[in-house]
Structures are given as C-alpha cells and as structure tokens.
Amino acid sequence: MKRLLDFTAEIEKKRNTDFLFLVPCCKEIEKYYEKLGYENFFKIRKIKFIGKNFKKPICKSPCTGTYFSNDFKCPVEKICDMVYNDTNYVKYCQKDINYAAKLYSKFFGGKIVTAGQNFAICFYCKNNILKIIYFCAGNFGDSKLLLNSIYKEFPSCLEYNFDVCAENEFFKSYSNSEFYGMIKPLNSHAEKAVLNIKKSKKFPYLGLPLD
C-alpha cells in the first residue's frame, strides 16, 4: 500500500497536483494513513431518520424526481457554487455527477431528487434503507423543501440515512459533525492552504463519497 501511494504522489506532483485525498474504511487504516502523511480534513454530519418517525416537512411545492440518465442536465456546478458559496467544499464537474448518476442508477436503483434549485443523490443500500449521499441544499427553507421531495419519492423506507455538509444549518441540531476523508498536500502552497483552513475550523465538505 505504501509503495502504491508513494508512486501515486510522485505521478501527481509531476502533474502539478496540489492534494491527494482518500477515505479510510476504518480507524486502523486511518492511523496507517496518518503515518504516510495524510490527515483528517473533511467533515460531514451523518443523520438517521427511522421511517415511521421521519417527519415530512410542510411545503406546497411539488416534488420533481429525476431518474438518473446520461442526459441529466441539472446545472450542478452552478447549483453547488450557489449552495456552498460560504463553505469550503470539493467541486465536482457535470461529468463527475453524471458518472455517479449512472453508477447508482444501474446498481442500486438510484435517483436524483430535485426541488427548485436543489438536488440530492439517493439510492437503496439494503433492506429498504435509503441512503442520501449528496444533499445539496443551502438555507433552512431549501433543506425542508428537498427533504419533502425525498419523502414523496421514497415514502415507505425503513430508514433514511443522510450524509450532509457539516455547515448545513437545518441539520446542526440532529448530530455532531465528524471527519470523513483525509488529505495530503503535495507542495508548500498546499500545506499553507490546509493549515489556514484548519485554523479557521471550517473544514471542507467532500460531497460525493470516495468509498
């Protein structure tokens, strides 16, 4: 593993890449990565709603669920810039989102649920449990609107498990934030950037999962 990661770092340095980042599968692996120069850097909130206790937010706007497809035209880059304009986050292009769309649609019955200028990537992980891996909604009202749309699209799940941005105000009362993902700066400029963000304690949102 060390040789592979060292080789990857050398290749990316030649490409002028600033960072490498990854998600460890367990605490033991996390400690191993720390020895190789990686450090915890990204944060999320993990929220679980039990189906029967999932309270449907009240809103009048209709749900517009969009199945994953190659022609998904939602302007995700602009939406993410708008939602996370005051938040550090990893920016994905339309191609990245479309790839995730096809992956979760083909293998997990996935769907992108939209509500106004907001969207969420949802899929079934097991036993009628819904996983929401990318909840892209900014303010309190937009989050309620998107939650309502998700509930309308998937009204009878046993559990609803969310991975959301740690800075999302709507979810702050539901759970504490936790680290999800590690980073390794590859040059002095990147090291300074990581240090400044750590000092601000505004840890970035990784968005699409890497595991």
Q: Where in the sequence are the language-model features?
A:
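Hydrophobic, Leu/Ile/Phe/Ala-enriched alpha-helical segments that form helix-helix packing faces
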Residues: 12, 79-87, 150-154
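A structural signal for well-ordered alpha-helical scaffolds and beta->alpha junctions
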Residues: 26, 72-76, 143-144
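Conserved GNAT acetyl-CoA-binding A-motif
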Residues: 5, 10-26, 154-165
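Amide-forming acyltransferase catalytic core, primarily the GNAT-like/NAT-type
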Residues: 36-132
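Helix-turn-helix
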Residues: 29
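Long, contiguous hydrophobic alpha-helical segments, chiefly transmembrane helices and signal peptides
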Residues: 1, 8, 22-24, 33, ...
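Active-site/acyl-donor-binding loops of N-acyltransferases
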Residues: 34-58, 124-127, 133-140, 148-211
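Conserved acetyl-CoA-binding loop-helix of GNAT-fold acetyltransferases
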Residues: 1-14, 35, 140-152
